[in-house]
Amino acid sequence: MFKNNIFTFLFCLLLSLNLAAQKPSTKEDTKKPKKEKTFEDIITKEAITDKGLFDIHKVKEKYYYEINDTLFGREMLMVTRIAKTASGLGFGGGKQNTQVLRWQKKDNKILLRVVSHNVVASDSLPVNEAVLNSNFEPILYSFKIESKGIDSTSTLIEVTKLFSEDVKPLGFPQSRRKGYKISSLNSKKSFIESIKSYPENIESRHVKTYNSSSPPSNSSTGTISLEINNSMILLPKVPMKRRYFDQRVGWFARSQVDYGLDVQESKSLKYLDRWRLEVKDEDLEKFKNGELVTPKKQIVYYIDRATPVKWRKYLKQGIEDWQIAFEEAGFKNAIIAKDPPTKEEDPDWSPEDVRYSVVRYLASPIPNANGPHVSDPRSGEILESDINWYHNVMTLLRNWFFVQTAAINEDARGVSFDDEVMGRLIRFVSAHEVGHTIGLPHNMGSSSAYPVDSLRSATFTKKYGTAPSIMDYARFNYIAQPEDKGVALMPDIGVYDKHSVRWGYRPIPDAKTAKDEKKTLDKWIRDNENSLMHRFGSAGIDPSSQTEDLGDDAVKASEYGILNLKRIVPNLNKWTSEDGKDYSDLQTMYGQVLSQFNRYMGHVSSNIGGVYQYYKTYDQEGPVYTHVKKSHQKKCMNFLNDQLFETPTWMIDNNILNKIEFAGITNRIRSTQSRTLNSILDFGKMARLIENEAINGKTAYTLIDMMSDLKEGIWKELYTHKTIDVYRRNLQLAYLDRISYIMNEEQGSIPSWARGRVTSVKVSQSDIRTVAIGQLLELKKDIKKHKNRSDKMTKMHLDMAMAKINKILVGKPI
């Protein structure tokens, strides 16, 4: 009975469980499908909205983009800059990354894709398919679609994480992360500062804090914080017609590999960065007839509201000085300067709006100014440019103008200039920086076009300035002497500047494509191929393309410059004095004198082992590269022996030294001499001397010639039987230290940016050490002959020199 009851109970239990499993859930029947949020549910009345390229909505701590559907597929340029940094990281404003992006709608997501224009082929060619297959657009970020816009013509996405998370292309550059050993983003100390929308761009600012095991030395937090600015700029629907680059005319350019060309290799094409200056349709006939016309759209620069009023007109003058160059291109009033509207006139005007190019005045101790620009990578069209003008650039200008012209120019004799004088200097730098913003790089070869003595002529310099290009680092006229009355002291927009602007900007109406323009562009270059004033030269191994130099003969120019420095030094106390102030200005300007002297030594020493570089094409006669003549190299070595290695005692002015330091002059002169000594005994320079002899034989200034001349100059006392003073003893020991370096070290790896400026050599498999040993053996014999006829200090010094020589000779294997 009991068993039957148990059986009955179990049967009923199983039956009830089975029936329960088959019965539908009442709860599931009553559950409603999840309702999708509407635009109004997400973008509430509390939202802060900024209308522009995308409408931006901020709801509490969340940011949303409302993207008009017509903008999907359009290409946009993302420019990432470091806006603000902590001390030790470098100053803000520097461009870190640029990428072309495309917003794509894919099912229920929005994709932000990276577009590359580095490799292309015409879409009408079969090879285009291969290019597309190898040029897949990676996805930078993916967003969920939150809702449609109110009128269903736009799409809403949340972008908070795009800027609050560590999206590397939009943050601190990967290359610099390694140096500071950054491990991760510290999200608790990172946040979005602002996102603002303008008609053609969106500006996002966010503070990023990174955990770092090797932060700048002044950081005690174990982190690095900086403010990042991302500019997303809508690119034109129709790219501007390109103009192809030619190395004979200096220009900022970009390159692209075109697989669609009818050649048997992949070929890189370079094209200019330049503003879109076009002739109005109604003015085309006037233009063809040689009349100047106003372009469809002018280049306009606004002067930052923060700029001190007294400097504004000079900044404007520097901008509009370029009008004369654009007239060569056929345009009048092509570039103009304006004050921005007041806040009352236009409360929405902002320097961050990409439609406006602005000279930004930055309250910073940095002695600098720069002129970067943003351009369309598809065509090179410059879209916008802001000149960063740091307040302390005036200190730099004062120092240059003082040390280079005070000997002949009363206006420069002081540590504070009249406003008119400083204004002229500001105008000069303004014009230089504007040159960068219209596409022109530095032309370091410009100043060597003028004969040195022409720079002492008032007639010549008033007509031509001090250099054919304001884009050279020609600075001010240090060659002019006190008797040269009325001579110009600084460059203007010159012959080369007009030539380059004409070449880069003058429209060629009959040319439909960039390729069609090439014949005309080549002719414009060939028309002036024999004119040094029209030459472009980039800094490198070419001694005629140097920074801070003037004239066609570095020796002669430097001799004039040193004469002026010798005039300045005795007057430094008087020209820097001010009652109630200490001697810090005296110390600064004395340091400037030594720096200027070092520049002269660099100008001359660059000729030793120097090679001239004159860009040419196949249809032009003559070599591209030519070694500096033997006679001139020897002249340069003699100059260095006389002016530098023979102690420059004119620097040793006790009336200055006893006011600025308790010690240091012996080390200062040693440092000045050893800097140039090490430059002369540079592996690359020595390798070029060897190659010069191999190619040109007896007409070359050889490595043995140079080393012999150097030894005889530095060890002159051995042959004249004079006492060796402390300055010369220091120099001679520096010489032996450098020879020891040559005998034991190899040339370091050459960074990619320097490969066009440095000659590579395997030192142990060259004649360099052979010649160095030969010089040491000769020197050893000469010391033995001389030391017994010397005073006690000289004898002790020569004993030390002999010990060093022996150590070098029996040192490491060679």
Regions found by a protein language model. Give the residues of each.
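Sec-exported extracytoplasmic/periplasmic mature domains
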Residues: 320-331, 435-436, 440, 476, ...
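Bacterial Sec-dependent N-terminal signal peptides
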Residues: 1-25
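Auxiliary tRNA-acceptor-end handling modules of aminoacyl-tRNA synthetases
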Residues: 23-63, 67-307, 325, 329, ...
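Soluble non-cytosolic domains of exported or imported proteins
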Residues: 66, 70, 94, 266, ...
